């Protein structure tokens, strides 16, 4: 596949969110984008639920979440949207699970989690939902792995994760669930573990080379990219924004040696990232400057280098993001105050 030139990328301003927010969860199903919950200007979790139509460039309000929440884990099972855990209006983790039927336009309560949790990582395969980790009411990270059986409306415990954590990144590849990074209390974890759905067992993979918070993970072809982030301050060490890029080769099963010339051009953390048309994209976030970053970059795997893209129209950090129809959407987030901006980085003709 031919990788597009940086000149082929452009930002489009889309219809803004109906209200400003941060920590909302996004989901694409049936070509539509759903925005679920989030926090308002006062940091209070919201019960808003809207759908965005790319064709009409329009947000439509849907029946509100029965339980207001932010940072909720979401997944689609056919024509149903499942929302799991998150933070409630009392600022505590939730055990509530709710399901929205797209055809009926109605919410239903489902079987609760065994323990309240926020920062759960969710993947779905064959109408089964897998929920890994999370942080409980006692603020301790969980090592739970549970699967939800939709036909029986039941959660079943599976083999626990070797490393307890919350806010990890997880993705499905074949019959394996890859779980990367995350946190224990305030501190970043560099564990990389894989659960085999068929054998129901965990395998520890080589740790992520650099431990950092607010980094991003992106998969492209047979590679997994670990990008940027914040090296946290401890004792005598100052916090430091990073431009590090680590690449894991999924065929070889190891981290590749990276030259400094392959690193990001800008140090950044808490940014938008994704893969578009054979390139890895990063945009916005926080860096060494006093204001939010507006810069965007694209990695060319053939040239092993980052190239400058057009700047974000509304610079932001802490955005929600999703890739839809060859566009990377940046939704809400923070620029001084909260933002309602929705912008898409698209490849020409998409």
From Swiss-Prot:
Asked if the record carries the keyword Repeat, the reply is: yes
Give the source's domain of life in one word: Eukaryota
What Pfam families does the record tag this protein with?
A: Kelch_1, Kelch_KLHDC2_KLHL20_DRC7
Query: SUPFAM superfamilies attached here?
Result: Galactose oxidase, central domain, Kelch motif
Keyword Nucleotidyltransferase on entry:
no
Q: Which residues form a coiled coil?
A: none
Alphabetical list of Gene3D superfamilies matching this protein? Kelch-type beta propeller (2.120.10.80)
Q: Which UniProt keywords apply?
A: Kelch repeat, Repeat
Show the InterPro entries listed in the entry: Gal_Oxase/kelch_b-propeller (IPR011043), Kelch-typ_b-propeller (IPR015915), Kelch_1 (IPR006652), Kelch_domain_containing_8 (IPR051746)
Kelch-type repeats, residues? 1-31, 32-79, 81-127, 128-175, 176-222, 224-278, 279-326
PANTHER family, per the entry: KELCH DOMAIN-CONTAINING PROTEIN 8A (PTHR46260:SF1), RING-TYPE DOMAIN-CONTAINING PROTEIN (PTHR46260)
What name does the UniProt record give this protein?
Kelch domain-containing protein 8A
- The species is Homo sapiens (Human)
Gene name of the encoded protein? KLHDC8A
């Amino acid at each position: 596949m031919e990788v597009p030139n940086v000149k082929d990328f452009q930002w489009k301003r889309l219809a803004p969110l109906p209200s400003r927010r941060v920590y909302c969860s996004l989901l694409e199903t049936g070509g539509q984008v759903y925005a679920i919950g989030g926090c308002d200007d006062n940091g209070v979790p919201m019960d808003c639920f809207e759908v965005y139509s790319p064709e009409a460039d329009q947000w439509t309000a849907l029946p509100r979440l029965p339980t207001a929440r932010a940072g909720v884990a979401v997944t689609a099972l056919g024509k149903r949207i499942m929302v799991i855990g998150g933070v409630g209006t009392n600022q505590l983790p939730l055990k509530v699970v709710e399901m929205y039927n797209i055809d009926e336009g109605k919410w239903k309560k489902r079987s609760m989690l065994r323990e309240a949790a926020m920062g759960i990582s969710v993947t779905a395969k064959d109408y089964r939902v897998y929920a890994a980790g999370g942080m409980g009411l006692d603020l301790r990270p969980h090592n739970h792995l549970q699967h939800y059986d939709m036909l029986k409306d039941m959660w079943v415990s599976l083999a626990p994760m070797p490393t307890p954590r919350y806010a990890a990144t997880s993705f499905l590849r074949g019959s394996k669930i890859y779980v990367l990074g995350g946190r224990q209390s305030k501190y970043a974890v560099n564990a990389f573990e894989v659960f085999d759905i068929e054998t129901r067992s965990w395998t520890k993979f080589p740790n992520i080379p650099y431990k950092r918070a607010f980094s991003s993970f992106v998969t492209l072809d047979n590679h997994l990219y670990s990008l940027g982030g914040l090296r946290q301050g401890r004792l005598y060490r100052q916090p430091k924004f990073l431009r590090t890029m680590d690449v894991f080769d999924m065929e070889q099963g190891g981290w590749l040696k990276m030259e400094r010339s392959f690193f990001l051009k800008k140090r950044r953390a808490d940014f938008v990232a994704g893969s578009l048309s054979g390139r890895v994209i990063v945009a916005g976030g926080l860096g060494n400057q006093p204001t939010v970053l507006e810069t965007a970059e694209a990695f060319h795997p053939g040239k092993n280098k980052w190239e400058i893209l057009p700047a974000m129209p509304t610079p932001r950090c802490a955005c929600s993001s999703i890739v839809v129809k060859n566009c990377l959407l940046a939704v809400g987030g923070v620029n001084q105050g909260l933002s309602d901006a929705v912008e898409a980085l698209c490849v020409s003709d998409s």
